[in-house]
């Protein structure tokens, strides 16, 4: 892992396929060691700053537990816990934190923020989520896919992403396919397709590794033969409620439900979601949406699919911690 030491983790295309694979291998080993009580602490004495301009359950807990398991200490800086971008520039914040911490995680808005932190901090910077990319999520996703199709190469797997494909998840899936050769199908209305330049770049790379990237509006053709169907919330973090009706009308036909799962003709197809999910009305926001838009059976995914044996979403959630631990170990462990 020496070639990853001190390296930033900002987006997946910053890595070679071999480096990406090495992170997955390390994550699997760390997961096994933790479960077998054999984990060895290699980050003892390290200090890690966690900058969250957007709140999160999984990302924060994953970084904190991973750090604690490895003997590191963390400082959580929440949405109101720092002056970044308000009273102090990102450049200055980077140079201050870089003098105090061994690594910095950023979860927030524009990709340019995490890129600036990386440019000036002088220590490894990790992207916990930006508007453009969500690389740690895809690392966990592919680890989960490996676990459920053991012995199968990524270029033998078919992953369908149904919904709004122009967001950070769609972009990072394109990059993951570019590195691994997945058969990636983005199933979405054309208004929700990613930028053509990124699609072209990732398609060319995916083909080199035995894969392909397809964009389609056709549900039946898009899901046929799929090994995994993935979706995400239709309303992104921080979006105005006024956009809800427009987005729901646009994406209602791409809901992951029993019919879509059956159209794969694969009885072993699995369901993926990065969470949180609007699959029922058991949350305040879920109740509001169910009432306003008649979505009592779920929004982007039905409760039937979410709670089915095909759903492996909590394996994904757990693997966030193991893969994030691998990233910190590889970039901080000497």
From Swiss-Prot:
Keywords: Amino-acid biosynthesis, Arginine biosynthesis, Cytoplasm, Metal-binding, Transferase, Zinc. L-ornithine binds at residues 168, 232, 236-237. The keyword Aminoacyl-tRNA synthetase does not apply. One of its GO terms (cellular component) is cytoplasm. Its EC number is 2.1.3.3. It catalyses: carbamoyl phosphate + L-ornithine = L-citrulline + phosphate + H(+). Its main location: cytoplasm. Pathway: Amino-acid biosynthesis; L-arginine biosynthesis; L-arginine from L-ornithine and carbamoyl phosphate: step 1/3. GO terms for molecular function: amino acid binding; metal ion binding; ornithine carbamoyltransferase activity. It is found in: Cytoplasm. One of its GO terms (biological process) is DNA damage response. InterPro entries: Asp/Orn_carbamoyltranf_P-bd (IPR006132), Asp/Orn_carbamoylTrfase (IPR006130), Asp/Orn_carbamoylTrfase_sf (IPR036901), Asp_carbamoyltransf_Asp/Orn-bd (IPR006131), Orn/put_carbamltrans (IPR002292), OTCase_ArgI (IPR024904). Carbamoyl phosphate binds at residues 56-59, 83, 107, 134-137, 274-275, 320. NCBIfam families: orni_carb_tr (TIGR00658), PRK12562.1 (NF009213). In E.coli strain K12, trimer of identical or non-identical chains are composed of ArgI (I) and/or ArgF (F). The trimer has the following composition: FFI, FFF, FII, III. E.coli strains B and W, which are known to contain only ArgI, produce only a trimer of identical chains (III). HAMAP family: OTCase (MF_01109). Reversibly catalyzes the transfer of the carbamoyl group from carbamoyl phosphate (CP) to the N(epsilon) atom of ornithine (ORN) to produce L-citrulline, which is a substrate for argininosuccinate synthetase, the enzyme involved in the final step in arginine biosynthesis. Belongs to the aspartate/ornithine carbamoyltransferase superfamily. OTCase family. This is Ornithine carbamoyltransferase subunit F.
